């Protein structure tokens, strides 16, 4: 795991074994654990309390036309962050027995400095009054590693007024630190 962005990889070990029929090698998962050292984001043994599979795949290429204008059922976004080559999404959506949770790169922006990445979440509307926590982890390396990419613009119907969340590369020359001597009091 990584703490954030391109931070060093951390390896966790546990005496608790996960059942291979529930968790396949290479599958992204969420863990609930306590580090035995008491220090988060350090390699070492942990006490594992729970593990859950996470939805996700590689980012797919698409267009507004091919995705019904990025049509998505409502999902409240709690957080979006990048860890290495993965974009991780945490939110709440309607319970679904067959959720369709995908991340698309708008193919018309593939070579842009800030390609547009769209989250599409569709439920089967079986239990309309129930909601549940949703985790997704998507491999965005095919976009992130492009030479023209300085970051991405993440779009979702769960973001106010059709806005986006910018996710920038750390070495992005467009990022300038604020001047601490400038008063911006309103």
Predicted features and spans:
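First exposed extracellular module after export/assembly in secreted or surface-exposed proteins
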Residues: 1-186
């Amino acid at each position: 795991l990584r703490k954030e962005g391109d931070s060093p990889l951390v390896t966790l070990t546990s005496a608790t074994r996960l059942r291979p029929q529930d968790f396949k090698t290479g599958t992204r998962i969420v863990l609930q654990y306590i580090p035995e050292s008491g220090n988060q984001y350090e390699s070492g043994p942990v006490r594992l309390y729970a593990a859950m599979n996470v939805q996700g795949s590689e980012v797919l290429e698409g267009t507004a036309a091919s995705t019904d204008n990025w049509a998505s059922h409502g999902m409240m976004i709690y957080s979006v962050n990048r860890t290495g080559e993965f974009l991780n999404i945490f939110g709440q959506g309607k319970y679904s027995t067959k959720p369709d949770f995908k991340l698309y790169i708008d193919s018309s922006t593939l070579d842009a400095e800030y390609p547009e990445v769209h989250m599409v979440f569709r439920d089967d509307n079986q239990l309309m009054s129930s909601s549940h926590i949703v985790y997704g982890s998507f491999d965005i390396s095919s976009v992130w590693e492009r030479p023209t990419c300085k970051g991405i613009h993440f779009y979702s119907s769960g973001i106010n007024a059709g806005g986006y969340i910018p996710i920038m590369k750390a070495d992005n020359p467009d990022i300038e630190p604020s001047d601490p001597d400038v008063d911006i009091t309103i």
